[in-house]
Amino acid sequence: MSEIENNKEPQLILPKQQAAFDRITAIGRIVLSLDRKQFPLSVRTNILITGESGAGKSFLVRAAALDLGLPILSLKTSEWMLLGSAGRGATPTWPRIHEFLMRCANLPGGVILIDELDKICDRTSWTTYLRSEAFSLLDLTVPPNLVDRDGDTIFEDSIEAAQRVLRSKILVVGAGAFQSIWDDRQRPEVGFLSAERRIASPDMGDLFRILPREILARFGSNLIVLPPLVEGDYFQMLDVFADRMPDFWKPRFIKLGRERIPAAARLKLGPRFYEELVLEMVLVERQEIANFHKDDWNQSGPANAVIDSDQEYEF
């Protein structure tokens, strides 16, 4: 789990993602500005984003939070720590959510992303408890009897304050691959068209047939489907990110990216591929420097090298 601070760097939204981005930000602005007390019914603002692994679900939510000017708390169900686990050296997730909500009390609002929702749909005893805690968040309900990171009781008035924040100024977004939705759609077909162009996104009827009923109960029809990223999308993102690179790094970034994009697209690495690419680019550059110094030393040879004892050399 990590809390992501906003920065001023604009995020890349592909044309195929624009409609999804616009809907997330539109609902986010409603969350921030709407007086819900005027309505006799609850306003359902939870959003569920589905798309195959590497489609850029969490990337899109972070971009929306940045556009809205809001902090985002990212949660993964695979890293969720249950209430009562503090005694085993772990910090439960819900007290951290409470901290985030109390921070947002003094801000226009916030975004909470619950990623990997598809991983809590089986029926093990562990996921039963995990599902209960995650669904409390989706139901906009802060559990009672919380303790903080130090094990001290969180007072009831603080829990009630967090509850008001959660229900009035927090956009809750769920995300999950629900990979079975996509597996049958990527089987090779006979024909001349590229397989990239034949991957069809599921429609609303498909989602209602496949998604667990208890998931649908928390989101209704407020579902967003992200189309898969194909190789051309990766090259488009490379060009945009390269334009933002310092001049020294830009050609290196492009060269390494073009070499590795086919594998990245095949492995469905998604937008995080470019973060890894930056590290690999720097590693390659550092290795080139190390090899240069080594070759320079080997060519001159230790017998021919003149070393000033007052000067430091790095090899």
Regions found by a protein language model. Name each.
Residues E3-N46:
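Pre-Walker A (pre-P-loop) alpha-helix and adjacent loop at the N terminus of AAA/AAA+ ATPase modules
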Residues R44-L75:
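Walker A/P-loop
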Residues S53-A55, D67, S78-L82, L117-I120, ...:
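Conserved nucleotide-binding/hydrolysis micro-motifs of P-loop NTPases
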Residues F59, D118-T124, L130-P228:
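Canonical AAA+ ATPase core
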Residues L60, E231-F315:
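C-terminal alpha-helical "lid" subdomain
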Residues D67-P71, N106-L107, F192-L267:
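Conserved C-terminal "switch" segment of AAA+ ATPases
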Residues I72-L107:
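Short glycine-rich substrate-engagement loop in P-loop NTPases that contacts/grips substrate
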